[in-house]
Design a protein with these regions (language model features):
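S-adenosyl-L-methionine
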Residues: 1-37, 45-53, 68, 405, ...
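Conserved S-adenosyl-L-methionine
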Residues: 32-89, 298-315, 453-523
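Conserved acidic residues
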Residues: 34, 286-288, 363, 471
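Conserved phosphoryl-transfer catalytic core
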Residues: 71-162, 168-169, 505-523
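Mobile active-site "lid"/loop adjacent to the S-adenosyl-L-methionine
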Residues: 296-348
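Conserved Class I SAM-dependent methyltransferase catalytic core
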Residues: 334-389, 393-395
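Class I S-adenosyl-L-methionine
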Residues: 377-422
């Protein structure tokens, strides 16, 4: 079994780390596959595992995922001296932000002790102002309330310091000090000139945020103080110093070689809808598209919207709940994208688009999908088998449910779709052949007179159109050997059989001008 490289990024719902060998082993064993398109790359575990073996093209419609894949596939060249200067800038920015909301920060620290009254902390969190609820009558929040008044969602604030997380997510997804740390880090990253280094630093920050967030395992909604136990859990997370944790993770990334790329090995990364990506990359018989599409109606833009906001850092307009006409509880972006694979009415059609685009180009296709998803496994199999020869592997998994202790059994199916040779654009190819005037006087076969000799130019055209380069042609009744001869001339391997011993001798004579090592002739 192959050993695959792993790297720590996010606590991610769609990670394929547990089935990585089931995905990568058949790809690596197939020497005809040179390029793998990781179409729904997520946190890039598949692409990162394969990059030592194949050319990898990464794509994901979510911007945070695009940044992560750029980082782990292409790395950066970031010296220890440059890193030390970076942390100095971060500390300066953090000190500035601490001064802006010093009263709220001092109050927050008083809760970072044992045996507090959880109701006091509950009130403190509920009184925290934000762009969603800009007013607070808590005097400890006076500075933060003033800061919030300068920020209008959807507009860049006229301030000379960063405060997006402080004004959007304080005491929601993160503590107040943590939001100051995130804003300081993000502002310092923006000042880094090299895009590769920016991507790596953003990935480090996202990884730490994922572990420190006041959530279960994602960012669909933040946890609230409702009891002593939830209060203790939240305070444990909010005591985490995000700057210091980023420094520690950078050490791991540096050990992995991710920060010391002397020459960039370029892996292309895209931030496109799956269909747009398939139209943008070169697909052919040496390409495999790995597709791990969304399984459910709950969309990744909902679960990881905070990370998109971090990467874009654009003070976004926020989504309104159409039923309550108020801001969504999860504080989602207005511009969240929704995949057709997550819509029951459109998911099967999306699969048909995926399969058809890949099959038409003659590319290999691998799909991973679970048995409790929107599209029934049998329907997906039927759809794939219309255009591919399909091998299916079932992998049994156990899933926890969003941080709960309950475990559910799930079957993950891996569809390995091998191109059906010679099926595409058949009508066009037959029309071309019809236009040919058959020529029987084969220069290679003139030395004998065989009654049913095939037109050599028609045979040649058939081989060129339907047999791939370095492919093999088999003629079960080769007769005078026209098919074998033309295949040899065109650089294909050839296998021929004929019950007639005279045909064997005639064909072997005809082939004396060519390399017989390319040809196997059996009676």
């Amino acid at each position: 079994m192959n050993q695959y490289n792993e790297i720590s990024t996010l606590q991610y719902m769609g990670s394929k780390a547990r089935i990585i060998s089931h995905i990568c082993d058949p790809i690596i064993k197939n020497n005809s596959i040179q390029t793998v398109v990781d179409l729904f790359a997520g946190t890039g575990s598949v692409g990162y595992a394969l990059k030592s073996y194949k050319n990898v093209i990464s794509n994901d419609i979510e911007y945070y995922a695009y940044i992560i894949n750029q980082a782990i596939l292409n790395g950066c060249n970031f010296s220890e001296l440059e890193e030390a200067s970076f942390w100095a800038v971060v500390e300066q920015k953090y000190m500035l932000l601490q001064e802006k909301v010093s009263t709220a920060l001092f109050a927050e620290k008083t809760f970072f002790v044992d045996n507090i009254d959880y109701k006091l902390y509950q009130t403190f969190c509920e009184k925290t102002p934000s762009v969603f609820e800009p007013h607070s009558d808590d005097p400890r929040m006076k500075e933060l309330t003033e800061l919030v008044s300068h920020v209008i969602p959807g507009n860049e604030p006229a301030l000379d310091f960063p405060c997006l997380f402080l004004t959007y997510f304080a005491n929601a997804y993160f503590g107040i000090a943590q939001c100051c740390q995130i804003d300081a880090l993000r502002s310092a990253i923006e000042q880094v000139m090299d895009e590769h280094t920016k991507n790596v630093l953003l990935t480090v920050l996202m990884s730490v945020m994922s572990a420190a967030a006041s959530t279960t395992t994602h960012f669909a909604q933040f946890l609230k103080v409702k009891s002593k136990s939830t209060c203790n859990n939240l305070l444990t997370k909010r005591k985490i110093n995000i700057i210091e944790e980023c420094k520690e993770l950078m050490k791991e990334y540096r050990k992995s070689g991710l920060c010391s790329k002397k020459e960039y090995t370029t892996f292309d990364c895209y931030n496109l809808d799956f269909s747009e990506c398939l139209d943008s990359v070169v697909l052919n018989k040496s390409t495999l598209v790995y597709a791990d599409p969304p399984y459910f109606k709950e969309h990744y833009s909902r679960y990881y919207h905070v990370l998109n906001t971090l990467c874009l850092y654009d003070y976004p307009a926020m989504a309104i709940n159409p039923q309550t006409h108020e801001f969504s509880i999860g504080r989602y972006r207005e511009d969240r994208r929704v995949s057709d694979f997550g819509k029951k009415a459109k998911a099967l059609g999306a699969f048909e688009t995926l399969i058809t685009k890949c099959a038409t180009a003659g590319a290999w296709l691998m799909i991973s999908y679970s048995d409790n998803s929107i599209v029934d496994i049998t329907d997906l199999q039927t759809l794939a088998e219309k255009q591919y020869d399909v091998l299916i592997e079932k992998v049994e998994l156990s899933h926890s449910k969003q941080g709960r202790s309950s475990i559910s059994k799930v079957d993950e199916y891996i569809f390995i779709c091998r191109p059906k040779e010679f099926v595409h654009d058949v009508n066009e190819k037959l029309l071309v052949i019809k236009e040919l005037k058959p020529i029987v006087d084969n220069p290679a076969g003139f030395m004998h007179n065989y009654m049913a000799r095939k037109p050599y130019n028609v045979v040649s055209e058939i081989i060129k159109r339907f047999c791939p380069d370095n492919g093999c042609v088999y003629d079960p009744m080769f007769g005078s050997g026209t098919t074998i001869i033309e295949a040899s001339k065109l650089g294909r391997k050839a296998i021929g059989t004929d019950i007639n011993l005279l045909a064997y001798k005639l064909c072997k004579t005809s082939l004396s001008r060519w390399d017989l090592n390319q040809v196997e002739i059996e009676i």
